Amino acid sequence: MNKHQKPVLTGQRFKTRKRDEKEKFEPTVFRDTLVQGLNEAGDDLEAVAKFLDSTGSRLDYRRYADTLFDILVAGSMLAPGGTRIDDGDKTKMTNHCVFSANEDHETIRNYAQVFNKLIRRYKYLEKAFEDEMKKLLLFLKAFSEAEQTKLAMLSGILLGNGTLPATILTSLFTDSLVKEGIAASFAVKLFKAWMAEKDANSVTSSLRKANLDKRLLELFPVNRQSVDHFAKYFTDAGLKELSDFLRVQQSLGTRKELQKELQERLSQECPIKEVVLYVKEEMKRNDLPETAVIGLLWTCVMNAVEWNKKEELVAEQALKHLKQYAPLLAVFSSQGQSELVLLQKVQEYCYDNIHFMKAFQKIVVLFYKADVLSEEAILKWYKEAHAAKGKSVFLDQMKKFVEWLQNAEEESESEGEES
């Protein structure tokens, strides 16, 4: 039975479109080329950087980014979990990598420069490198203590020079790393290297931007997640700046919660005695100073009412409102420093809210008569402790009252001498 031949077009060539071509996935070929080049460059990191720069045009860094970074850090391709795939075959590994380097800051910084140059040259590797570092932090248990230390130093230096974002640290919150104490130990080494590159303010600013400032306690198991434990651990390790930072962050969080609750109670017009008891309990429980609380109270009291938009009416409304809450403010302005904080808060509020500009002196006099502010605090504020905002306006408003206070003080002194 004869088969009919299908017609054939002659003179035509059909090429596979480039996007349809499939590259054979051969990370082993990539590995062998990379390992050979690194071994030839040896300990000369300038030569390593040049090799990586030129080889990027021949090797597919984009496709094999994880293999590239595995070898540069660990000297070998890594299996899931962090074990070395080629551990038994030394020809497929290199000792010219971060894990085989000397454990000192300057040496690891030189390696960090290799990564910087590579990523500047091949910008598309930036995200892949970030993912690689997150992965390596998850694999910490598979690495020796010395390797963990070098990885911590590398991470800290790269965080310091901006090559890596602080979000890589989220890998440290993995349960297994936290429970075995690896997370906290690694974090200490990382932060030390970071602070050797940048000051504490820069480090804490990066943590805030990455929303990690409130998660630092998670480096420890649940039963040790206290500010005191964190502070001792990090202070003992020479990182007191981080301990202080965490205390401030925790205090800010507590203050926000306290302000929210206070606002709620004032809006419900709770009796002042109840509010006083609540605030005192919170101060004791959270170790809050009176200077912090008086500022919160002022803000809450002023937020508890909708103010008249007319300047001539707002002063009368403010005095009526503040007279009601003067007993509350008086309880928490028992110290000279607290009184000065309150005076500065009043000054700033009156400056920021233009309708209150002319009410400042009247508010201060009201607080003086209600025993919220003492004569000493008002005189100190006038002479040296006033804020910069609108100071000329407010000092001028207070001039006559201050003169009256000074005259009264002189009279009482002369009466005391006569008696």
From Swiss-Prot:
Record carries keyword Phosphoprotein: yes
UniProt KW keywords: Acetylation, Cytoplasm, Phosphoprotein, Translation regulation
GO cellular component terms given for this protein: cytoplasm
GO BP annotations, alphabetical order: regulation of translational initiation
Keyword Phosphoprotein part of the UniProt annotation: yes
InterPro entries: ARM-type_fold, eIF5-mimic_regulator, W2_BZW1/2, W2_domain
Residues the record lists as Phosphoserine modifications: 412, 414, 419
Domain of life where this protein originates: Eukaryota
Ranges for domain W2: 248-415
Record PTM N6-acetyllysine, positions in chain: 117
Name of a matching Pfam family: W2
Disordered as annotated region, ranges: 1-22
Complexes and interactors: Interacts with EIF3E, EIF2S2 and EIF3C.
Annotated PANTHER family: BASIC LEUCINE ZIPPER AND W2 DOMAIN-CONTAINING PROTEIN, EIF5-MIMIC PROTEIN 1
Name listed for the protein in its UniProt record: eIF5-mimic protein 1
Originating species: Rattus norvegicus
Gene name of this polypeptide: Bzw2
